[in-house]
Amino acid sequence: MNQALPNSFRSGPDERGHFGIYGGRFVAETLMPLILDLEKAYAEAKADPAFRAEMDNHLKHYVGRPSALYFAERLTEHFGGAKIYFKREDLNHTGAHKVNNVLGQIMLAKRMGKPRVIAETGAGMHGVATATMCAKFGLECVVFMGAVDVERQQPNVLRMKALGAEVRPVTSGANTLKDAMNEALRDWVTNVHDTFYCIGTVAGPHPYPMMVRDFQAVIGQEVREQIMQAEGRLPDSLVACIGGGSNAMGLFHPFLDDPGVAIYGVEAAGHGLDKLHAASIAGGKPGVLHGNRTYLLMDADGQIEEAHSISAGLDYPGVGPEHSWLHDVGRVNFLSATDTEALDAFKLCCRLEGIIPALEPSHALAKVADLAPKLPKDHLMVVNMSGRGDKDLASVAEHLGGKF
């Protein structure tokens, strides 16, 4: 914590993909040429105005951006403190923030001449976004999904199949997101010649954490413009949920060098931090998983522990390496919310705002319930409403015994 602070919190990663001691490229030798190819292709695409122009066109006409910045009037009134705004990523085509990143990666796959795309998915939102973009751009799509998640996210499984994707249930480990990612990496090693791996969060080997962050930064860039229009100044705080952390990184990154903006990331505390949870920063330590060094849930022998969250999208035993670094340098405050707190926030948002939030951003809303009442009425707080909750209704009904 006492390390010298950087001149900018936005300059990472270095050329080897490190954010301080985190990140990097811990991959099998067979994958190294692919990773280097991808890095080169991404650098070229980033420097190509035609790539950016095409992407902006699809974001506007296909995804439906910019997404609204909405003043949550009744929630603000209810808490009696900070003025709360929602960044409405739930209104994007496919229903979450995931599509911002997938559009960029699928355009890159097309540019690299890869006809086959693989992806891992937890809640199914990244899988749906990938299947959607593969259909739009005419690419083959295979999605790896833990068998447990296939059960609890049936609507999304059906959406992926309707869009022409093959969904492969993964029955190893805890049958959830970590295991789906393991399988996807195995498939990639086997099919290096024709396959593009579309990772759904700011994790994995470099350049993925940087690339996904760059594609998601459209969220925070829009918020800067929208809040200036609405309030004439920048927000005082930002709040977002964290699984791997791509929705949060998309909101946070454009504000990291604004010292007046407090930033809160909310992890999933599951049944409690002393029990089963998915809060890698609150309850983990640095280690290596899925190609990068970051905070992980590990036992005393360094074995990866199973994560638990009511939300399939936060149920991951790690976190993006840039978040790990931002925690260590003290720029982002990491909090956590339990399953029960998230369910309470879910119900409150439905009843007060007429918005059914996904269980993921319900974790962020749960901490808004703690933070907002203690803040003055002129405090501007922006919460990332990262996805809609249709996919979670069956699961929520089950937890609430059928009584909403």
From Swiss-Prot:
Enzyme Commission code(s) on record: 4.2.1.20
Any GO MF annotation of the entry: tryptophan synthase activity
Matching InterPro entries: Trp_synth_b_CS, Trp_synth_beta, Trp_synth_beta/beta-like, TrpB-like_PALP, TrpB-like_PALP_sf
CDD domains, sorted: Trp-synth_B
GO cellular component, one term: cytoplasm
Modified residues (N6-(pyridoxal phosphate)lysine): 98
Record key words, sorted: Amino-acid biosynthesis, Aromatic amino acid biosynthesis, Lyase, Pyridoxal phosphate, Tryptophan biosynthesis
Catalyses which reaction(s): (1S,2R)-1-C-(indol-3-yl)glycerol 3-phosphate + L-serine = D-glyceraldehyde 3-phosphate + L-tryptophan + H2O
Cofactor(s) needed by this chain: pyridoxal 5'-phosphate
SUPFAM superfamilies: Tryptophan synthase beta subunit-like PLP-dependent enzymes
Pathway connected to this protein: Amino-acid biosynthesis; L-tryptophan biosynthesis; L-tryptophan from chorismate: step 5/5
Function comment: The beta subunit is responsible for the synthesis of L-tryptophan from indole and L-serine.
NCBIfam families listed in its UniProt record: trpB
Similarity remark: Belongs to the TrpB family.
Complex formation: Tetramer of two alpha and two beta chains.
Protein name: Tryptophan synthase beta chain
